[in-house]
Structure formats: C-alpha cells, structure tokens
C-alpha cells in the first residue's frame, strides 16, 4: 500500500543513483532510487529540493516511488 507525501531530498548520489528523502510529516527518512523520478526531474536532482512521492514498503524499509519535483 502506498501513501502520497511531500518531503525534501536529503542526499542523492548520482553514481549509485540512490539517496534519501525526509518526509514533511516528520516520519523516518525514506530511500529513493533515480528510477523513481521522471527523466526530466532526475537531471536537476539535488539535495534540498521539495518533492512529492508515494511511500511504499520496500525490501529494505520505506521507499519513495513516483517522485516529482513540487
């Protein structure tokens, strides 16, 4: 089950394509992979950007899916 949320990109490593998002509701940070972004948004991805995403339960804990810049 997914839940739509907003948050801020905490970290993002272009080499690995992985990072973390801090949810605006104060919950624990969630993992994000570059494949969760649209190609256009992935090009400008840097820490500090506000995003909208769906929080899903991944194999290694909370994960962000369907991520868009807001």
Swiss-Prot record:
GO terms for biological process: regulation of gene expression. GO terms for cellular component: cytosol. The keyword DNA-binding applies. Keywords: Activator, Cytoplasm, DNA-binding, Transcription, Transcription regulation. It is found in: Cytoplasm. CDD domains: CSP_CDS (cd04458). PROSITE patterns: CSD_1, CSD_2. This is Cold shock-like protein CspH. It comes from Escherichia coli (strain K12). The keyword Zinc does not apply. InterPro entries: Cold_shock_CspA, Cold_shock_domain, CSD, CSD_CS, CSP_DNA-bd, NA-bd_OB-fold. One of its GO terms (molecular function) is DNA binding. It comes from the Bacteria. Residues 7-67 form the CSD domain. Gene3D superfamilies: Nucleic acid-binding proteins.
């Amino acid at each position: 089950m997914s839940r739509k949320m907003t948050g801020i990109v905490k970290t993002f490593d272009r080499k690995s394509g992985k990072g973390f998002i801090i949810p605006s509701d104060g919950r624990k940070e969630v993992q994000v992979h570059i494949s969760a972004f649209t190609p256009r948004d992935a090009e400008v991805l840097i820490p500090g950007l506000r995003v909208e995403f769906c929080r899903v339960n991944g194999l290694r804990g909370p994960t962000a899916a369907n991520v868009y810049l807001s």
